[in-house]
Regions:
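Outer membrane beta-barrel
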Residues: 51-72, 87, 92-223, 229-263, ...
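Short, polar loop/linker segments at the starts of domains and inter-domain junctions
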Residues: 75-85
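N-terminal secretory signal peptides that target proteins for export/translocation
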Residues: 1-3
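Detector for intrinsically disordered, low-structure N-terminal pre-sequences
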Residues: 6, 10, 15, 281-282, ...
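Outer-membrane beta-barrel pore domains
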Residues: 23-35, 73, 91-92, 137-140, ...
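N-terminal periplasmic/intermembrane-space "pro-region" immediately following the signal or transit peptide
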Residues: 6-7, 13, 19-68, 74-77, ...
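Hydrophobic alpha-helical membrane context
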Residues: 14-15, 211, 415
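Short glycine/proline-rich turn/loop motifs
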Residues: 84-87, 294
């Protein structure tokens, strides 16, 4: 699926297939999360049977998102000669204009009772001009493919996932924009430290009476290969939590997650988003390449080992929502070093949804990340961000949002491009998802 031709052929094939596999307005598969507004504030899939199995069903979905960027940036870094008389710390000039339109193609297939497949392809993304597969997995909620009713009492509480997939570390990744899939993100940008990666692995879930437990593992690699023996070991992850609808107006959720890898040539947890940041070219020098995709976010660049812990409280009281994040990450400077350093991230957002169907919302988010740079003896630096957003769901599948963002970089060395750096301004985004 590396070429547009192959993707178009794939779309055509499954579109024809879906004409036969789908009937009526029901596009919901068993034990799945809706891609539109109905999936707001949904984290892991539940054990509630959202639809009845009637045979093979193919759902062709997707999303498309476009932003207008009106940001400016500044710094006070010292002049650093690139060898040709140019200052590598001079920031590139920005203009108010549109970013690249992004698009996803989703293929979801109900293969058997309680057995479904998900595949997502990035058709257009900031980091890759060509279409490529982001991830795919098989989810098992029933074992009827072994024999009808096999271990139903167990599978009433258990879910299994296996694939080259987005790992379930923390709750923040459920509310982030995944390339063009941005309906469930109240804001335009994701976190400063964007904890997201896709790795080959498996996860087992226990869900009962509001309790959630998950254990999983992955091979610790974003890019798969078989020619680097011993350089990366298995990564392990887990999650414990409680999610309860206390009464019709009040929902409470609290989870804690861990991801750990004791031997990795490269750590991908904070660099795994190949789609790219929403804030194009901010705090980048005049020599920066146009395909740079990480501007506006921060990768601590751990190597060799990592243990990351994330705690997420969530509260919804009628139209008022609070979602919080505390993250502590401790990792190695390099694969050959025993030194470790730590980064902490805090985030809190308050959203108020209103209107007959809560189609309008306003919200604010504060996000801060702080820690040591590559030298474990270096001084701690801090990055702070404030986001204010207002949004309108025109329909369940279309949202328009506008965001004010201000991000500052503190305590960086005078010779760093991030010295007293700041970017701020307005972002406007329109998104479609189905």
């Amino acid at each position: 699926m590396k070429t547009l031709t192959s993707v178009l052929l794939l779309v055509s094939f499954f579109f024809v297939s879906s004409l036969f596999a789908q009937t009526g307005p029901d596009r919901q598969l068993q034990y799945s999360k809706p891609a539109d507004k109905h999936g707001l504030n949904m984290f892991e899939t539940t054990k509630e049977e959202t639809s009845e199995f009637v045979g093979l069903k193919v759902i062709l979905g997707g999303s498309s998102t476009l932003q207008f960027q009106g940001l400016n940036h500044s710094n006070s870094a010292l002049f650093v000669d690139d060898g040709n008389g140019a200052n590598i710390n001079e920031l590139i000039e920005l203009e108010n204009n549109f970013n690249l339109a992004t698009a996803n193609l989703d293929l979801d297939v109900q293969l058997h009772n309680g057995l479904r497949m998900h595949l997502r392809t990035y058709l257009s993304s900031r980091h890759h001009p060509e279409p490529y597969v982001k991830s795919g997995y098989l989810q098992v909620d029933r074992l009827d493919f072994v024999s009808p009713g096999f271990l139903d009492n167990v599978m009433d509480m258990v879910t299994l996932k296996v694939g080259h997939m987005e790992i379930n570390y923390g709750d923040a990744h459920f509310r982030r924009s995944d390339n063009s899939a941005s309906l469930h993100n109240p804001f335009v940008g994701n976190y400063i430290m964007d904890s997201f990666t896709t790795e080959v692995g498996a996860e087992a879930y226990l869900k009962t009476n509001g309790f959630l437990g998950m254990l999983g593992f992955s091979n610790g690699k974003l890019n798969q290969d078989v020619t680097s023996p011993g350089e990366t070991s298995l990564a392990f992850l887990g999650k414990l939590g409680f999610d309860k609808q206390v009464n019709p107006g009040l929902r409470l959720r609290l989870t804690g997650s861990i991801y750990t890898n004791g031997n990795a040539k490269q750590i991908y947890l904070y660099s795994g988003d190949r789609a790219g940041s929403r804030y194009y070219s901010v705090i980048k020098g005049i020599t920066a390449t146009r395909d740079n995709f990480s501007s506006g976010r921060w990768n601590p660049n751990f190597s060799g080992k990592l243990t990351a812990i994330m705690i997420n409280p969530f509260l919804k009281w009628n139209g008022l929502e609070f979602f919080g994040t505390y993250e502590n990450s401790s990792g190695g400077d390099s694969i050959n070093s025993n030194d470790t350093r730590t980064w902490n991230q805090l985030a809190g957002e308050v959203i108020y949804r209103f209107g007959a169907s809560e189609q309008w919302y306003g919200g604010a988010r504060f996000n801060s990340a702080s820690g040591k740079l590559a030298n474990a003896d270096a001084e701690k630096v801090t990055i702070n961000r404030v986001q204010l957003a207002f949004g309108w769901f025109l329909t369940d599948k279309v949202v328009a949002k506008i965001e004010y963002v201000s991000q500052s970089y503190n305590d960086f060395a005078a010779g760093s491009i991030y010295s007293d750096a700041n970017f701020k301004g307005i972002m406007a985004e329109a998104a479609i998802g189905f």
